[in-house]
Amino acid sequence: MSIPQELYYTKDHEWLRKEGDEVVIGITRFAADQLGDVVFVELPQVEDTLQMGGTFGVVESVKAASDLFSPITGQVIATNPDLAEAPELVNEDPYGKGWMLRLKPEDPAQMDALLTAQAYTAWLETCSSFAVRFGQNLTL
Protein backbone atom coordinates (compact mmCIF):
# COMPACT_ATOMS: atom_id res chain seq x y z
CA MET A 1 0.00 0.00 0.00
CA SER A 2 1.43 3.34 -1.04
CA ILE A 3 1.44 6.04 1.64
CA PRO A 4 1.84 9.56 0.17
CA GLN A 5 4.87 11.11 1.87
CA GLU A 6 3.72 14.74 1.70
CA LEU A 7 0.59 14.24 3.81
CA TYR A 8 -0.08 14.23 7.55
CA TYR A 9 -2.00 11.36 9.16
CA THR A 10 -4.01 10.41 12.24
CA LYS A 11 -4.36 7.13 14.11
CA ASP A 12 -8.01 7.27 13.02
CA HIS A 13 -6.77 6.81 9.43
CA GLU A 14 -7.43 10.29 8.13
CA TRP A 15 -5.02 12.30 6.01
CA LEU A 16 -4.43 16.04 5.84
CA ARG A 17 -2.78 18.11 3.14
CA LYS A 18 -1.68 21.73 3.64
CA GLU A 19 -2.66 24.02 0.78
CA GLY A 20 -1.58 27.53 1.65
CA ASP A 21 -3.45 28.54 4.81
CA GLU A 22 -6.05 25.79 4.29
CA VAL A 23 -6.09 22.07 5.01
CA VAL A 24 -7.76 19.36 2.92
CA ILE A 25 -8.94 16.24 4.81
CA GLY A 26 -9.91 12.73 3.70
CA ILE A 27 -9.58 9.11 4.78
CA THR A 28 -6.63 6.89 3.95
CA ARG A 29 -6.48 3.99 1.52
CA PHE A 30 -6.29 1.68 4.55
CA ALA A 31 -9.54 3.11 5.95
CA ALA A 32 -11.27 2.92 2.57
CA ASP A 33 -10.17 -0.70 2.11
CA GLN A 34 -11.34 -1.65 5.61
CA LEU A 35 -14.73 -0.07 5.04
CA GLY A 36 -15.34 -1.75 1.70
CA ASP A 37 -17.56 -0.13 -0.91
CA VAL A 38 -18.57 3.32 0.34
CA VAL A 39 -22.24 4.06 -0.41
CA PHE A 40 -22.85 7.33 1.46
CA VAL A 41 -20.82 10.16 3.00
CA GLU A 42 -22.34 12.67 5.44
CA LEU A 43 -20.29 15.84 5.81
CA PRO A 44 -20.70 19.08 7.79
CA GLN A 45 -22.01 22.33 6.36
CA VAL A 46 -19.74 25.01 4.98
CA GLU A 47 -18.96 27.54 7.74
CA ASP A 48 -19.42 24.94 10.51
CA THR A 49 -16.66 25.04 13.11
CA LEU A 50 -15.09 21.68 13.90
CA GLN A 51 -13.36 20.91 17.18
CA MET A 52 -10.26 18.74 17.30
CA GLY A 53 -11.36 15.21 18.23
CA GLY A 54 -15.04 15.90 17.58
CA THR A 55 -17.05 14.06 14.97
CA PHE A 56 -17.66 15.84 11.68
CA GLY A 57 -19.48 13.24 9.63
CA VAL A 58 -20.13 9.62 8.80
CA VAL A 59 -18.97 7.25 6.08
CA GLU A 60 -21.37 4.40 5.32
CA SER A 61 -20.26 1.34 3.42
CA VAL A 62 -21.67 -2.06 2.61
CA LYS A 63 -19.88 -3.33 5.76
CA ALA A 64 -20.25 -0.59 8.36
CA ALA A 65 -20.93 3.03 9.24
CA SER A 66 -18.00 4.90 10.75
CA ASP A 67 -17.77 8.31 12.35
CA LEU A 68 -15.24 10.79 11.03
CA PHE A 69 -13.19 12.71 13.60
CA SER A 70 -11.72 16.15 13.11
CA PRO A 71 -7.94 16.02 13.53
CA ILE A 72 -7.73 19.78 14.07
CA THR A 73 -9.97 22.70 15.03
CA GLY A 74 -11.13 24.94 12.24
CA GLN A 75 -13.90 26.30 10.06
CA VAL A 76 -15.21 24.29 7.11
CA ILE A 77 -14.74 26.32 3.95
CA ALA A 78 -15.69 23.60 1.43
CA THR A 79 -16.92 20.03 1.21
CA ASN A 80 -16.48 17.72 -1.76
CA PRO A 81 -19.68 18.13 -3.80
CA ASP A 82 -18.90 15.04 -5.90
CA LEU A 83 -19.30 12.66 -2.95
CA ALA A 84 -23.08 13.18 -2.82
CA GLU A 85 -23.52 11.56 -6.24
CA ALA A 86 -20.36 9.44 -6.32
CA PRO A 87 -19.36 8.27 -2.81
CA GLU A 88 -17.31 5.51 -4.43
CA LEU A 89 -14.65 8.16 -5.11
CA VAL A 90 -13.54 7.57 -1.51
CA ASN A 91 -12.55 4.02 -2.53
CA GLU A 92 -11.32 4.81 -6.02
CA ASP A 93 -9.13 7.82 -5.22
CA PRO A 94 -8.96 8.49 -1.46
CA TYR A 95 -6.02 10.91 -1.73
CA GLY A 96 -7.38 12.81 -4.73
CA LYS A 97 -10.97 12.97 -5.97
CA GLY A 98 -12.20 11.30 -2.75
CA TRP A 99 -11.21 14.24 -0.50
CA MET A 100 -13.90 15.18 2.02
CA LEU A 101 -13.50 18.72 3.27
CA ARG A 102 -11.37 21.82 3.31
CA LEU A 103 -10.74 23.64 6.61
CA LYS A 104 -9.33 26.97 7.66
CA PRO A 105 -7.36 25.90 10.78
CA GLU A 106 -7.86 27.89 13.96
CA ASP A 107 -4.37 26.95 15.16
CA PRO A 108 -2.04 25.63 12.44
CA ALA A 109 0.34 24.40 15.17
CA GLN A 110 -2.12 21.54 15.81
CA MET A 111 -0.71 19.97 12.64
CA ASP A 112 2.54 19.38 14.54
CA ALA A 113 0.86 16.66 16.62
CA LEU A 114 -0.11 14.61 13.55
CA LEU A 115 1.75 11.61 12.17
CA THR A 116 4.26 11.78 9.34
CA ALA A 117 3.99 9.20 6.56
CA GLN A 118 6.77 7.20 8.25
CA ALA A 119 5.01 7.25 11.64
CA TYR A 120 1.68 6.35 10.01
CA THR A 121 3.31 3.39 8.24
CA ALA A 122 4.61 2.18 11.62
CA TRP A 123 1.11 2.63 13.08
CA LEU A 124 -0.36 0.49 10.27
CA GLU A 125 2.18 -2.23 11.03
CA THR A 126 1.10 -2.14 14.68
CA CYS A 127 -2.56 -2.39 13.67
CA SER A 128 -1.83 -5.30 11.34
CA SER A 129 0.24 -7.12 13.97
CA PHE A 130 -2.59 -6.74 16.47
CA ALA A 131 -5.11 -8.13 13.98
CA VAL A 132 -2.93 -11.14 13.17
CA ARG A 133 -2.10 -11.78 16.82
CA PHE A 134 -5.71 -11.75 17.94
CA GLY A 135 -7.17 -13.17 14.73
CA GLN A 136 -9.48 -10.25 14.09
CA ASN A 137 -10.48 -8.22 11.10
CA LEU A 138 -9.79 -4.57 11.59
CA THR A 139 -12.79 -2.35 11.25
CA LEU A 140 -13.01 1.36 11.74
UniProtKB/Swiss-Prot annotation:
Cofactor binding note of this UniProt entry: Binds 1 lipoyl cofactor covalently.
SUPFAM superfamilies: Single hybrid motif
UniProt GO BP: glycine decarboxylation via glycine cleavage system
InterPro entries: Biotin_lipoyl, GCV_H, GCV_H/Fam206, GCV_H_sub, Single_hybrid_motif
This protein's GO CC annotations: cytosol; glycine cleavage complex
Database matches in HAMAP family: GcvH (MF_00272)
Function of the protein: The glycine cleavage system catalyzes the degradation of glycine. The H protein shuttles the methylamine group of glycine from the P protein to the T protein.
NCBIfam families according to UniProt: gcvH (TIGR00527), PRK01202.1 (NF002270)
Name the record gives this protein: Glycine cleavage system H protein
